[in-house]
A protein has these predicted regions:
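Interdomain boundary/hinge segments at the C-termini of tandem beta-sandwich modules
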Residues: 15-19, 104-108
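Solvent-exposed, low-complexity, repeat-rich "mucin-like" stalks and linkers
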Residues: 22-67
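Extracellular Ig-like/FN3 beta-sandwich strand-entry sites
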Residues: 54, 85-89, 212
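Short, aromatic/His-centered strand-loop micro-motif at the edge of beta-sheets
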Residues: 194-216
Length: 285
């Protein structure tokens, strides 16, 4: 109220001065094996990458004063994993530019391309609401095999989930899991899976490129009670984003099907020729 305090007000805070980092050391590296797929007639973008799963990653830093101690991952930048078969290098970088690396394994599998019916799922004006359109017939994925789907994704652009939706279920339409384009899902088998995506770094930019994005989705029946889903999206801005769901469980390997649905979105499925053309054009940009 403009009056002087009767006693002085004193405030203080203690700050810890942290010396500069001189070296980073990998104490333990993640053990996840990344998997991607190729199918005749379908081309994946050459610059596709996986988001690095950091489960199990522990890093220590050595500082200018010679002391070494644990450093939390939020103080580090971790590169993505190239979508290429073999041992791939991941770079860990401190804020002052000091780097170290570790390696992960990437495996390539083969898939069979499928064009489901109808060729256009949902209305092209994206007016069909959640769960309002499904395939005429679910696609069976036999034990130990992968099915590949390629389509143009149309979106209302209102929310992240207004895009393609993948439904994994049995012949009686009892769901194992449902996964969305924004790397989220649910179902009895979903909780156990390992998931990751590159688009989550900037959802706003990702969403702005999804109305007209070219998408490849690979669904794998691992023949061990689990299934995987990998999606590769090339937005209208040319940016490539990927997502994965590894180890969806509670799956009956002999009774496993995939369906697609929409949520204020539309999927225009490709033939093998049109799928190849989509990404060939992207490579020429």
């Amino acid at each position: 109220k403009g009056e002087n305090a009767s006693t002085p007000i004193v405030a203080q805070k203690t700050f810890e001065v942290v010396p500069a980092i001189t070296a980073l050391h990998i104490v333990s590296a993640p053990q996840l094996v990344y998997k991607y797929y190729e199918a005749a007639g379908v081309t994946n973008p050459a610059n596709a990458e996986f988001a690095t799963n950091t489960a199990g990653l522990k890093v220590q830093a050595t500082y200018l004063d010679g002391k070494t101690r644990d450093i939390t991952l939020d103080k580090l930048t971790i590169s993505n994993v190239p979508m290429k078969a073999g041992k791939q290098e991941v770079t860990v970088t401190a804020k002052n530019g000091v780097k170290t690396t570790f390696h992960v394994n990437v495996e390539k599998g083969n898939a069979t391309f499928v064009t489901p019916s109808p060729a256009i799922l949902g209305a092209e004006d994206c007016s069909v609401a959640w769960w309002g359109a499904h395939l005429d017939e679910d696609i069976k994925v036999p034990a130990g095999e992968t099915r590949a789907f390629s389509f143009t994704n149309l979106s209302s652009g209102a929310l992240n989930y207004n895009n393609f939706v993948v439904v994994l279920r049995n012949a009686a339409k009892v769901e194992y899991a449902v996964v969305r384009a924004d790397n989220y899902g649910w179902g009895n088998g979903y909780a156990a899976c390992t998931l990751g995506c590159t688009g989550g770094v900037d959802w706003k930019t990702w969403l702005s490129g999804m109305n007209g994005a070219k998408v490849n989705v690979y669904v794998t029946n691992n023949n061990n009670g689990t299934a995987d889903v990998v999606a590769i999206m090339q937005g209208t801005d040319g940016k490539v984003n990927t997502q994965y769901y590894y180890g969806i469980n509670t799956v009956d390997a002999n009774d496993f099907y995939v369906d697609f649905t929409v949520d204020c979105s539309c999927l225009k499925f490709d033939s093998a020729a049109s799928a190849r053309k989509h990404y060939t054009r992207a490579h020429r940009r």
